[in-house]
Amino acid sequence: MNFKKVYILALLLLFKLGFAQEVLPVYSDYLSDNYYLLHPSMAGAANCAKLRITARQQWFDQSQAPALQTVSFNGRINDRSGAGVILINDRNGFHSQRGIRLSYAHHLKFDRDDVDLNQLSFGLSTGFAQSVIDETTFKQFDPSVNGGIQQKANYFNIDVGTSYNYFDFYLHFTIKNLLASERNLYTQKEATNLRRFILNTGYTFGDEKSFVWEPSIMFQNVSQTKESIVDFNLKVYKSLNDGAAKIWGGVSYRRSLDGAEYFEGNSIGSLSGGTISSQKLQYVTPILGLNYKNFMISYTYSQLVQQVKFDTAGFHQLTLGLNLFCKPERYHCNCPAVN
């Protein structure tokens, strides 16, 4: 039997499994005006309470393809404190996970006056999740598979983080899944270390009457696997109708700093007649959004761009948002995450 290409998908498999057991996978939804999804220190940091509903679907042409839905809400408790909640529903084939995260943030202000943004924030988030393996449709040909049941396990973990917003500059750092967590639902030898370090930084500049630009970077490091991933982002904002509406868009490029080797050739049983190549995970995500009064809608589409990939279809994501209990924009800065 001839095979045009034989692929070893180690990198992509590692990428998917690296996210599979976390309460909330790290995708590009934070770019839809929702840094709170990643950083509990951003709870209540803005002048409005923010409700965000996100649905992400991968590979529409595949049965039981990965899908994720989140509902998040965060807002101010008082001038120096904020709180939030995130609801999560994540599915991938016969595996699913539901969870809730509760957050509290404290904000320290170093403003010279009421219009200069200089704020340091600290946040804590507690998370509860239930993982499920649905074996009700499994055939009992393997004694190690129970079949006919749903296996369930509950997990608890915490995130801690800090944010610094200074005029048009921002910096966020969070340690996710700080505690060791046993995951005996799958095997007795699953790693208990789910710790992930996330760093975001960016800067906005431009003219509010014309265009405002926001370049940013996100860096991730996974403690257990030592894998590192970086996002390079660029967003642009344009106000319409005297500020009643704002259209914005941009692009994100994600790249793994770690690679994997694969064999490309005409035979599975022999390495002869082929070559060993390597590649790194990378995909591009364009994003388009619209704010009208207190409403927000955004759409993102992620497309893998490396040679080896599971499927040619991309990942679609839609976010709906509503800003509540808004106060007048306080700070003189191009800071859409705060003003």
Language-model regions, residue ranges each:
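Sec/Tat signal peptide C-region and signal peptidase I cleavage site
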Residues: 16-20
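Subset of outer-membrane beta-barrel
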Residues: 21-339
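Sec-dependent N-terminal signal peptides
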Residues: 5-15
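Positively charged n-region of N-terminal signal peptides that target proteins for export
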Residues: 1-6, 112
